[in-house]
Amino acid sequence: MTKKLYIETHGCQMNEYDSSRMVDLLGEHQALEVTEKPEEADVILLNTCSIREKAQDKVFSQLGRWRELKQANPDLVIGVGGCVASQEGAAIRDRAPYVDVVFGPQTLHRLPEMIDAARTTKTAQVDISFPEIEKFDRLPEPRVDGPSAFVSVMEGCSKYCTFCVVPYTRGEEVSRPLADVLLEITQLTDKGVKEVTLLGQNVNGYRGATPDGRIADFAELLHAVAALDGIERIRYTTSHPLEFSDAIIAAHAEIPQLVKYLHLPVQSGSDRILAAMKRNHTALEYKSRIRKLRAAVPDILISSDFIVGFPGETEKDFEQTMKLIEDVGFDFSFSFIYSSRPGTPAADLVDDTPDEVKKQRLAILQHRINQYGFENSRRMVGTVQRILVSDYSKKDPGMLQGRTEQNRIVNFRCDNPRLIGQFVDVHIDDALPHSLRGTLLDASTVN
């Protein structure tokens, strides 16, 4: 009988990438096939996020729901990975003693032997070490699920922003060798992938060894990826303003495959708060980078992350954040109320802003950025957009959907599955709050 794997992923795109590689790994080494139903699974894995307190609470709530499955099937293996696993380690079993395997982002390649050991010894297996970049040497060739794929180019972060747990849960920055990244992308394009998203906690900090002993920076990596056969679009995330260099800006102007969309987190528009966060740049320096980028690529859209209610944030600080939003005109944001994370420097700061004030500020910020995003979408009405068709529409099986280079989901009436994985031109007829609708112009050239 075929053994089944159920995997649930919380958090960032790095976690999504890691989960996909776990599927590849366990498919090759243990012949596990993915199921969408945890009650069918022989192995259940939870890939976790610890960026906010609610995300961490969600982990133990989910584990609690799986406890009955373990009681009904003692041979079921339950594993917890990701940043909560890295942060909590064996302590996870204090609250969920039925967990069999605890592994960190850098040790997921050891899953097959950890699962085997848990089964044979009937004892929990815990490995949350940081063996640098070893995991990539132990992972099989990636499988493909559609025309787009994530590729991790580096791990960890060395910025140590005062609010962030990433350096403690994923380690410091370690870059994959240039040739390794290019090999993985070539393996993907050979299987039909046309768009890659390069991933890292701070991709701008990429410093990968080259075959001739040099160190390639991120701009060089972008040019090298663009030179590969079959690559028609390149995205990347996440970036840090401090290392968003002139060379990267030039790459945006020079590389046609680079999309006209950039996620460049700023977190706050207040220099005082930015200093308290240890972001090591000012709001003016951030705006200067954006101005230079827009001079090179006038129609590029910018998104960001924002933290509202950081300890000590005053009304003036928030007004400065809103001023930055007005000046830049962000298209989208991941924005949240500050969540204190144990072990970070900011956890020791006095948080004296009332919760209601934080909620009000967040609502104001999100409303304004949503306005900018919708304005950008409405400007696309009447234009022709080149989209990469990814799948059928989730809400209407009579429609296909894809994404523009400016990161807009477009739905259009068509039931021809041959278009999935292809680039097509779509006339944009209408802008909705979270997507566009259009009309397919000509699919006669699609084979």
From Swiss-Prot:
GO terms, molecular function: 4 iron, 4 sulfur cluster binding; metal ion binding; N6-isopentenyladenosine methylthiotransferase activity
SMART domains referenced in this protein's UniProt entry, alphabetically: Elp3
Domain Radical SAM core: 143-375
Cystine residue pairs: none
Cofactor(s) needed: [4Fe-4S] cluster
Pfam families assigned: Radical_SAM, TRAM, UPF0004
Database matches in CDD domains: Radical_SAM
Primary location class: cytoplasm
Complexes and interactors: Monomer.
Family: Belongs to the methylthiotransferase family. MiaB subfamily.
HAMAP family: tRNA_metthiotr_MiaB (MF_01864)
NCBIfam families: miaB-methiolase, MiaB/RimO family radical SAM methylthiotransferase
Function noted in UniProt: Catalyzes the methylthiolation of N6-(dimethylallyl)adenosine (i(6)A), leading to the formation of 2-methylthio-N6-(dimethylallyl)adenosine (ms(2)i(6)A) at position 37 in tRNAs that read codons beginning with uridine.
Name of the protein: tRNA-2-methylthio-N(6)-dimethylallyladenosine synthase
Organism this protein belongs to: Ectopseudomonas mendocina (strain ymp)
Upper classification of the organism: Bacteria, Pseudomonadati, Pseudomonadota, Gammaproteobacteria, Pseudomonadales
